[in-house]
Curated annotation (Swiss-Prot):
GO terms for biological process: ATP synthesis coupled electron transport. PANTHER family: NADH-UBIQUINONE OXIDOREDUCTASE CHAIN 4L, NADH-UBIQUINONE OXIDOREDUCTASE SUBUNIT ND4L. NDH-1 is composed of 13 different subunits. Subunits NuoA, H, J, K, L, M, N constitute the membrane sector of the complex. It comes from Buchnera aphidicola subsp. Cinara cedri (strain Cc). Keywords: Cell membrane, Membrane, NAD, Quinone, Translocase, Transmembrane, Transmembrane helix, Transport, Ubiquinone. The keyword DNA repair does not apply. The gene is nuoK. It catalyses: a quinone + NADH + 5 H(+)(in) = a quinol + NAD(+) + 4 H(+)(out). One of its GO terms (cellular component) is NADH dehydrogenase complex. This is NADH-quinone oxidoreductase subunit K.
Length: 100
């Protein structure tokens, strides 16, 4: 079992990987995956805090956040599909040029 320090280290590393990936990528799908990595790193932190304080509330919060994230991903993928069908690209810079 992981100790609290290792768990928070993994959570912080995942958070920064998500931030860096969010800043580097210009494809909407990769940006969505980066946001999911960020959300999951925050969820991991909540679970570790709940385990440390021996509270079940964080597990309930985990289920709620995962449900919201799943709905978010499905809606965003549907929007991305429509964008791709219309403009034939998911590159944010090309979409910005098209919209001008």
């Amino acid at each position: 079992m992981l100790s609290l320090n290792y768990g928070f280290t993994i959570s912080i590393i995942l958070f920064f990987i998500g931030i860096i990936s969010l800043l580097i990528h210009k494809n909407l799908i990769f940006i969505l995956v980066s946001l999911e990595v960020l959300i999951n790193s925050i969820i991991l932190g909540f679970i570790l805090i709940g385990k440390y304080w021996k509270q079940i509330d964080c597990c309930v919060l985990y289920i709620f956040i995962v449900t919201i994230a799943t709905v978010e991903v499905s809606v965003m993928l549907a929007i991305f599909l429509r964008i791709y069908q219309r403009y034939h690209t998911l590159d944010i810079y090309k979409l910005r040029e098209i919209s001008k």
